[in-house]
Amino acid sequence: MGNIRGTTRCPLTMSRRGWGRVLVCGRVAADEAGHDIVGAGECLAAPHVLRSMCHIRVREVLTSCVADHAVFLSVEGDAYVYGRNREGQCGVSGSGWLYHARCLDRERDFEPPLAADDVIATGATGATHTLLVTAQGAVYAAGSHEHGECGMHTRETPFKRVDMPFGVVHAACGRAWSLVVTREGHVYGMGSCESGVLGDGMYRHTGPSRLVYDCVWQPMRIAPLVNIARVSCGESHAAALDHEGYVEVWGTARLARLGGGTARGQGSPVRIPQFVRKQQRVRSVVCGRTSTWCVAQAHRLWAAGTWRAEGDGGPNQSVQIYRPLQELADYDVHCVAAGADTFQCLASSRVWSWGEAA
């Protein structure tokens, strides 16, 4: 279900009303088609209103560049799940794929049940797991826990509360790992440490040239990160934005996705020097599968890594350090979403899309 892969959190409201309808386009029913190329006749070539959500006022859509499922948050405080559910990542049982969005029950689908005065405020989706964050700072997780990505020792369905020392305000999920941001601006990670994505570089030598990465089964603080506002996860890298507009990145540097100008991966967070000057601080950062995107305070979109099949920004011409996207140089960019192969942004009151078959 490649069409829903993309982080769609935007600092702006979806409209002046503060809500909108869920639109979907591209390939659907990935459980049947797998990841094979499908014919154009099997894809939605234009945005369509998702029928099962047509009567719901939605304020936020949660998905990612590695997920084949999504969570829709309504203005009434309800959470709807949709898409692949083979590992229980939607928090409900009995179906490997949810063709119709399902509203999560506050008592049946959460353990312990959500408090009467609490609602789901935000969340994140990984490849086979989901995190939901409540307005009171609690974190609930569901799905696969093979590498510890849910912060517990068992696969969870329904959503089960994760033990956290502090209240959480933001979350992000990679393929087999998760990050959460607390009210104090600290970042905690859990899951697989492969490629240094948990910011501590933990690994074990099992031979002269073979490494085995450890797993973190409970939330562990990433000490170098302080005063953090938001985090974002790609396939095997991550980025953090602090309250002053500085950007920190870590993980694998393959295909230049970190934008640090080097092919060396980073096991601990490093600050991007291009955004140190006050005039070039960042307002939002989003990780794609093999790229990183930053919206500067001046509303310019900067990119690093690989996001095209060929040409500038392709595998043979990866962008080594962050640079403005020239196609949008004349527009004010407000937010950006990065999927597996496609990208969208809101610029000058228009939605722009690019990428594979965009």
What are these regions (language model features)?
Residues 1-358:
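Eukaryote-biased RCC1-like beta-propeller repeat architecture
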